[in-house]
């Protein structure tokens, strides 16, 4: 390379240094000073990664004094360049020597980089274009937010998330039965709301015992980094903000923290977009005396636009409390309890009509009459005729059924605010096997009970029942050695023998009290050395996590985990299938929660439930009532709370007095009432609610679409090429898994999201679900999104030169491939990306300015190209400049035409979709008060905003590839 003092060059490998000046020439070396960064670099004259900066007529050259020159003539004198042209400030003729050019010049625009000789490798152009296509594909996906989470593709969960997550400020109650995955549904909704920009600030309120579990679950399953707030964290945050809640976007805290007046006031003032409340059945309410917890959540629900309430037992604390939770979601709609009860009484007709539609059979006359009356504002005769016909395609008939079902669901009941799936409507659950083990009552307990009855006559009914169910507690009250009870309790002997006989099986043991759990751990450890661990409310969150992990270890882990009632709430251990109930809770819903720790979706084995009990005691009576009265061990019992409230008095009497005749009578009455309630529930509102909640065939199709995305080999290839170009080390570690590590040769100094010690990843959902230590890679994963951002926000791949070896074309023929990005600046929350996301526009020009892109695809063209080295590429560009300048202008004309087509198409799509949705909701509002005014107004405002953003849509040249035909 011919170097001279004072010449200006730019580094191809360190463009951030700015413009360099040749300051020394010694032998075979050249020294450049970079004034912008005050650094020097020494290069070999023969192979320096440098490009001479020479502007062309028409370019703007900037002086180090701040003014610029529109170049009209380029003069070379003594190997230095002098530019002549028009002064930007005076408008007069002026000259500018290259030594006086602005030191901070950087060539960011693709055409500037091309003419400055900053030319990228051929494959980088392709990777950049693929990155832009991937970003566009994700933004336009109607499944955005559902594919990325590390969760199983379970239809009802995905359906609820799909329906709720797409709404503006959703306000719903998620009330699936235990084990159906409400936390996953909530996480999917949160993930969707964040990815689509519908929400940015999210507050999750959970019981204190579940804070860390939510933190881990959100990170491990959804790649969402929440922060746990307690009083200490709030105090620390004062250093950054007067309101601690403003220091993070995603916050998890306990209800206890918000009971404090100051913290509640700060939370109310924190501009949340979405609030999630777990275990919402703890929010007790009466019209005259709402609980403090309820009032806290109510205050927040009045200022936070979106609200998700999670509860497995919507009626656990009574129907009135269920109404109160609906009231939190929409106080205007659920304003009066009596009116709510009256409306519920009409659900039976709706459910019967829905059942007839869902049956797949011809509709009886009474069902047709009922449907006609319920949907009186619409002529449904054509749909009825299709359903009743005998010569019509079954798929067409099913479409007609689905349409009428949707009309029913939209217009009646709480379908838009309440989702509740039951095990009866969701497949995939194991069989429950119940085993009872009678044990003789120890004489020590008999004596303690007799003494206790004399001394504790003042106890109320609840106190007496509690003592009757836990004789070990009575004994401990009279024995100085409170732990000695396990030395003679036959249930402990049975437990030890069971564990010894089933050494290879993981066993979950649940007892009501933490003290009992600790005593059992001591007994198993000291008497037989059985590896166990405990889990109770007195332990810290980290201690519980360690205990859970120790139990989960297949090799060297604990055989048994002993939990207290409260300590196990919200924790799931479906890798185990043996459940021992050392005692029984006095509440059918708590019993179901215990069994639900193992009996849930994801359980691959039958769940065996073992109940050791003391004969002829309250324990046996309660076990009999649960088993023979409610069938609660072998089946879920949705009516358990109703039966318990109805039979509480005779049940408590039987537990205290243990009268056989009274027990027999109680069991008979309970069985009769159980069957009645089961029949009522089959016929009532629940059927319609479940049809809406599990999604039916639509949910199955949704899951099929997601599964097809998982099998997209094109995505896998694109992501691996992306990591190759960035310089990420990739090492296969078994079938379907890759270890990613940062390398010293990465294109970028840091790769956010890629740990320094590496990460193991897979594209296989099943593997990711079976291995917590392996990340599931989809297009939505942060490590992929970050990689796409690194490429598209940098200059990587913006310029390229290639050779096309094709003897059918004249040698020296030029093609210019231009990639433009059509984009409109708009806040993410506007949802503009649904209609016009950043869109790559490809233009392929021949030397005459003809656009060949419709006839020559990118893939077919790219396969024929070969790379050239950078020095030759730079010479080819310089030799082609006179041809290229008019081609750029021509390319922009073609791109502008494409931009208008894109904008018009986006406007038509937006207007059609939102107008249709607005008209649908306006029609529904006339017959279903669940439609909120805010939803309608939001759509109207959104249409106006989007039209404005589309008017401002712009083009930007993103990448250039110059191609020359060669016969060599």
From Swiss-Prot:
DEAH box (motif): residue ranges: 278-281
| GO biological process, alphabetically ordered | regulation of DNA-templated transcription
Keyword vocabulary terms for this entry: Activator, ATP-binding, DNA-binding, Helicase, Hydrolase, Nucleotide-binding, Transcription, Transcription regulation
Its EC number is: 3.6.4.-
Q: Does the keyword Secreted apply?
A: no
- What are the residue boundaries of the Helicase ATP-binding domain, all occurrences included? 163-332
Instruction: Indicate which residues the UniProt annotation says bind ATP.
Output: 176-183
Single annotated GO MF: helicase activity
Mind telling me which PROSITE patterns this protein's record contains? HELICASE_ATP_BIND_1 (PS51192), HELICASE_CTER (PS51194)
Domain (Helicase C-terminal): residue spans on this chain = 491-641
Q: What class of enzyme is it?
A: hydrolase
* Disulphide bridges: none
InterPro entries hit by this protein: Helicase_ATP-bd, Helicase_C-like, Helicase_RapA, P-loop_NTPase, RapA_C, SNF2-like_sf, SNF2/RAD54-like_C, SNF2_N
Q: Which Gene3D superfamilies match?
A: 2.30.30.140, 2.30.30.930, 3.30.360.80, 6.10.140.1500, 6.10.140.2230, P-loop containing nucleotide triphosphate hydrolases, Tandem AAA-ATPase domain
**Keyword Cell division appears in the UniProt entry:** no
Per the record, the domain of life is Bacteria
Q: HAMAP family attached here?
A: Helicase_RapA (MF_01821)
| Quaternary structure annotation from Swiss-Prot or TrEMBL | Interacts with the RNAP. Has a higher affinity for the core RNAP than for the holoenzyme. Its ATPase activity is stimulated by binding to RNAP.
Family per record:
Belongs to the SNF2/RAD54 helicase family. RapA subfamily.
NCBIfam families for the chain: PRK04914.1
Which function does this protein serve? Transcription regulator that activates transcription by stimulating RNA polymerase (RNAP) recycling in case of stress conditions such as supercoiled DNA or high salt concentrations. Probably acts by releasing the RNAP, when it is trapped or immobilized on tightly supercoiled DNA. Does not activate transcription on linear DNA. Probably not involved in DNA repair.
User: What protein does this entry describe?
Assistant: RNA polymerase-associated protein RapA
Gene from which this protein is expressed:
rapA
